[in-house]
């Protein structure tokens, strides 16, 4: 085997790999395959951006980072709420578990704002479904 010092450096960067999702090729029996959909928070992030900064855009890389951030926070809250429900011998995660999980995960003032916004959103949803 040759050592690493003898190898030639790569002449160009490797080709970027494209994601294999969203294929519409035909299968063996001639039927079209359904597209694989990847759910993201991109449209919601974009709507919030336009509400706060109407003249500002966002790159795909930034959108990907924010999407990962939202997924991470969602997973942390869900995991903590699940633990809280298990501690209290409950099989259902209620708004109370979510609220407590948010208070445990998010620091100080951020938790207070998140709880108040969450309460406001649940109240708004409840009033719209009853009307």
UniProtKB/Swiss-Prot annotation:
Which keywords has UniProt assigned to this entry? Acetylation, Chromosome, DNA-binding, Isopeptide bond, Methylation, Nucleosome core, Nucleus, Phosphoprotein, Ubl conjugation
Q: Give all N6-methyllysine modified positions.
A: 23
One Pfam family linked to the record: Histone
Q: Where, per UniProt, does this protein localize? A: Nucleus; Chromosome
Q: Which residues carry this modification: N6-acetyllysine?
A: 7-8, 12, 17-18, 22-23
Query: Compositional bias (Basic and acidic residues) at which positions?
Result: 1-19
Residues recorded with modification Phosphoserine: 11
For this entry, list what GO says about its biological process.
Answer: chromatin organization; regulation of DNA-templated transcription
The protein's job, in short, is: Core component of nucleosome. Nucleosomes wrap and compact DNA into chromatin, limiting DNA accessibility to the cellular machineries which require DNA as a template. Histones thereby play a central role in transcription regulation, DNA repair, DNA replication and chromosomal stability. DNA accessibility is regulated via a complex set of post-translational modifications of histones, also called histone code, and nucleosome remodeling.
Quaternary data: The nucleosome is a histone octamer containing two molecules each of H2A, H2B, H3 and H4 assembled in one H3-H4 heterotetramer and two H2A-H2B heterodimers. The octamer wraps approximately 147 bp of DNA. Interacts with NAP1.
- What is the name attached to this protein's record? Histone H2B.2
Organism listed in the record: Saccharomyces cerevisiae (strain ATCC 204508 / S288c) (Baker's yeast)
């Amino acid at each position: 085997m040759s050592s690493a010092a003898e190898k030639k450096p790569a002449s160009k960067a490797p080709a970027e790999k494209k994601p294999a999702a969203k294929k519409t090729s035909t299968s063996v029996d001639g039927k079209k395959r359904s597209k694989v959909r990847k759910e993201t928070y991109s449209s919601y992030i974009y709507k919030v951006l336009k509400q706060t900064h109407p003249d500002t855009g966002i790159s795909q890389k930034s959108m990907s980072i924010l999407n990962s951030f939202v997924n991470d926070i969602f997973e942390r809250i869900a995991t903590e709420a699940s633990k809280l429900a298990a501690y209290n011998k409950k099989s259902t995660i209620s708004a109370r578990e979510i609220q407590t999980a948010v208070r445990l995960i998010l620091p100080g003032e951020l938790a207070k704002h998140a709880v108040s916004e969450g309460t406001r959103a649940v109240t708004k949803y409840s009033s719209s479904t009853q009307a």
